[in-house]
Structure formats: C-alpha cells, structure tokens
Amino acid sequence: MRRFLSALCLAFACLAAPAMAATSVSDDSQDADKLPSEMPGYSMGMLRELADRVQRTGLGMDMIPALYRPHYLSISDADLSMENEDIVFLVTYPDNRVRVYPRRVLVWHEVVNDVLPDADGLLPPPLPGVPEAAGEEYCITYAPLSGSVVAFRSKAGKYPSSFGVTGYLLNGNSMLYDRVSRSLWNQLLGICIEGPFKGKRLERIPVLSARWKGVKERYGGLDSQFNGKVEVLSRSTGFKRSYGKDPYGSYHSPGTYYDNNHLPFTIDSLDTRLPPKKRILGIEVDSAFGAVQKDAVRQVRVLNFTLGITPLVALHDEEIDAVRVFDRRLQGQEQPLSFVIFEDKLIDEQTRSEWLPTGKSTYGKLREKELSPLLAIDSMWFAWASLYRNTRIFPPPGQ
C-alpha cells in the first residue's frame, strides 16, 4: 500500500514537468497521415500528434494492476461493505446479465477484464497460451483523474485481448494497452493512437453511473424482476488495497482533487465554457459531439434537445440517481416525441402517454413502447472537450 501511494505522489510530481512523448511509430508518408481513422474527425496524422503529446507520469506499466476474471457477490453480500451514496457503474450484457462495478474498487485498478459465463454458469477455460481468446470478454475502464467510465468489447482489431494500464496520460485521461500487440489506446476516445492497431477503434457498450442505495433497492428487492440476476464486483481481488478509501480524495469532502478546478497535468486546449471538472455525459451522433450537463438534468428531470439532425432527450432516474439519453423517435417513426413533467409524471406531449426514466411507456396510447438509448460517456468536462473538439453543450451554458 505505501509503495503504491508513494508512486502515486511521484506521478503527480512528474506531471508538473514538461510532457514527455511516448515513442512514436515511424511513418514519413504524408499521404498515410491523411488517411482517416475509425474515429470521426481524426486522421492518422492527428493520431500521430496525439501520441507525441502522451505524458509519462512516473508510474510504470501495470503498476496500477488491472483485474482479470474477478469474483462477484450478490447484492445482499456486497451491501455489507458498501455505503448508500457510493457511486457504482452498471453494465447490462447481451444475455441480460447485470453486473455492478463499485467505483471504490475501480479507482484502484482502472481496468476490469471481464469474461461472461456460459449458459450453464461456467467460465470457459483459457486456451493454452492464449488466455484472451476464451469466452465472451469485455473491458470496463475507469480513469480517476478525468472521471470517465467507458466499457468495451475486448477486441484489439479483430483479436480478442485483455487490457492493462500503462500509467501514461493524454490530457489527463488514461492510456491503456492491449496484451496482444501492446499498442496504446486512449480510454476516452477508445482508439489506438500508436502501435500495430493504430487507427482502430474499440466497440463501446453502454455503462450507467448510479448510486448504490437506489441500485440495491431496484435490483435486489425480493419482488424485483432482477432478483438473483445481478452480480457486484467483489473487493476480494487478490490485491491489498484500502477499498474503503479513494486515493484521490472524495466527491463529498472539500479540499480534494474532485472539489477544485486545479489540473495537475498538461491539457492541450482547455475549453472554459464549463468548469473543468463539471460532470457531463458525452455523446456522439453522426460525427457530431455533445455534452449533457448532468446536474442541469437532475434539476429539471427532462431535457429535450437536438444534436445535428437527431432529436434527443435526457432523463433523470431519481431512484438510482442516473441520467440516460434517448432518441425521441420511436422505431419506424420519423416524427419525434417531446417530453415534459406533468403532475409529477413524465409524459409525451403528442399522446399524453406516461413514461419511465428508463425509456419505457407504462400507460396510454404508447404503452409498452420503448425509446432507443444512446451510448453516453460519463466524464469530467475538461477531458471530453480536449479530445472531442467542437462539442455542443446541453443545456447551453448560462441557461
């Protein structure tokens, strides 16, 4: 523990020094630099520039240990070591399995390499010499300094791979590496900026930030449809860490990293339209980028807006303190719905049908209809804006 905290302090000290570029892959072809990557708005040449701005922090590769095939608990067992206000991250997998990842654990590891069990509830055994190639794998990542949480399918290019933590930063956001080629990937962009997979982008899956109190009540109740189907990441990781504490401070205590606007690392371009550590949901639609202010949505509960030509709505789920973003058009229909709060109920103005903040209608003409969710990335503003340029803010600052 002392060694880890000492390394952490060294990391912040090193960040005060000029940026040190990661070793770049040599490519003198100007034509190659103009080629597009899989990330909208980023050419291969722009990725080269990002790689040149990667900062070394003093932490070596894997000094922050990623988890691989960790253990899980029931909600009732996990509750014994959780606080009601703890932040947790929820992922609903394709088989409708729900897994909960406490931020208290991820802040110490940053990466969880997860493998889903088969239909019989068994984990497939690793293949000889290629442990990454067995099972349906996913990667849940959390970058503490930028507060960004992103989940991916664990494939580097076409190859299954687990991921590790490099200890490098790009605009305060974590850099990861895959264990197949050791290429460098930026967590927030989900793109490889250096190595054999340069220009490739990871397939992202939705992850929801919420509060433990609401999550355990909704998913763990005896009458819950999810009863017995939800698993919580265990603190029994095999590593000695103070999982009850956050090495960076607390969201609830003044005077910590999360409570001020100081950034102890280099930012290429600081967008001052919002405070740097303001919590936002970053969204991407048809190559247009947006940032939804979470606290603004909490206050009004519903926010109708349009990004590009896509009509969207952000809804606050008060029970679990989560914000989701949906397309306001029902499947097969071009005319968008508009949502309001009427007599403390969420309704659409077109049919007066009632809706849940999960995007499902429960009463009226549209009963049982569901809105299509939009993938949204929970992050601090400074990190998102530095990598997703020309981002529109909803609601606009000052409103």
Question: Model segments located where?
Answer:
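Bacterial N-terminal signal peptides
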Residues: 7-17
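Positively charged n-region of N-terminal signal peptides that target proteins for export
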Residues: 1-4
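Mid-to-C-terminal functional-domain signal that highlights helix-capping/loop sites
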Residues: 22-399
